[in-house]
Amino acid sequence: RAASGFEVDIIIFEPYSREVKYAIEVKSCEEVQNRHLKGIRAFREEHPQCHYICISHDKSPRMTDDGIEIWPVDEFLKQLWSGRFF
C-alpha cells in the first residue's frame, strides 16, 4: 500500500535485498483505462525502480506512455511460464 492509501494487488521482492522488483495490478475489465491505474501509479511514486504490470482482459499487450505494461491474462501466463518475468 502506498502512503496515499492506494494499493497494488501483487508485489514481488528481490529475495535478499527486499527491494520491490515487480508491482502487479489485476483488473477484470476488457480494456484498461487511465482510471484503472491510479493505484499502481501512486505506488510507483514510492518505488520508482521496479517494473509495473497490469493484467487484464485486453486483447493484446501494450505499454502506457509512462511505462506500465498491460498484458492480457492468457498472454501474461504464457510469458510467466516461459521465464520472461522471473
Which ranges hold each PLM region?
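A cross-kingdom feature that marks ATP-driven nucleic-acid transaction machinery
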Residues: 1-86
